[in-house]
Regions:
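Glycine-rich phosphate/dinucleotide-binding loop and adjoining beta-alpha-beta core of small-molecule
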Residues: 1-5, 43-52, 57-168
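Positively charged, low-complexity intrinsically disordered leader regions
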Residues: 1-47
């Protein structure tokens, strides 16, 4: 893990950027593209990518990364607890719908065994489940997904913070 900024620093930077006209959507695109570039730079063959997404902005970053990786001819599978059209956050839902239109493959609410089998095929897994706003106890399905991911032995790139850990 390579921490760069703490949560309060991130909030200050985001507020400053929005004050000078950078939208939250633009920030999400930048984060998603940066995550995709980082994944591609991890070394070795990066052709099969699994992205575990949550329902908030961290998940939105994952959907943007999925679209970017798909455009680089990676086989991308996004694992999500809900259908893209059912995501409640407007921005994350828009990013999910856009990624689906771009041809990103989606797996909704997999069983434990389905997830274990999928993770075994991944060259890299992007963890975009829970971001810097997370605190408290991890709830289903993310508790199961985190357990499967930790036991998989897969190479993992966490966006913002490893899911389940408090950034506070």
């Amino acid at each position: 893990m390579q921490p760069v900024l703490n949560v309060e620093d991130i909030k200050r930077v985001e507020i400053a950027l929005t004050r000078v006209g950078v939208s939250v959507s633009e920030l999400m695109h930048r984060a998603g593209y940066a995550a995709a570039q980082e994944a591609l730079g991890m070394g070795g063959d990066i052709s099969n990518v699994v992205i575990l997404v949550g329902l908030g902005n961290n998940g939105g970053d994952g959907w943007v990364a999925a679209e970017a990786l798909r455009s680089r001819n990676c086989n991308v599978k996004v694992v999500t607890p809900l259908e893209p059209d059912q995501i409640s956050g407007d921005l994350a839902r828009q990013m999910a719908q856009r990624a689906v239109r771009a041809g990103v493959s989606v797996l909704v609410g997999p069983s434990r065994q389905e997830l274990i089998d999928l993770l075994a095929t991944a060259d890299v897994v992007l963890d975009c489940m829970l971001g810097t706003g997370f605190h408290g106890k991890v709830r289903a399905p993310f508790d199961i997904w985190i357990e499967c991911l930790n036991q998989s032995g897969a190479r993992v790139l966490s966006v913002d913070v490893p899911s389940g850990l408090s950034a506070q």
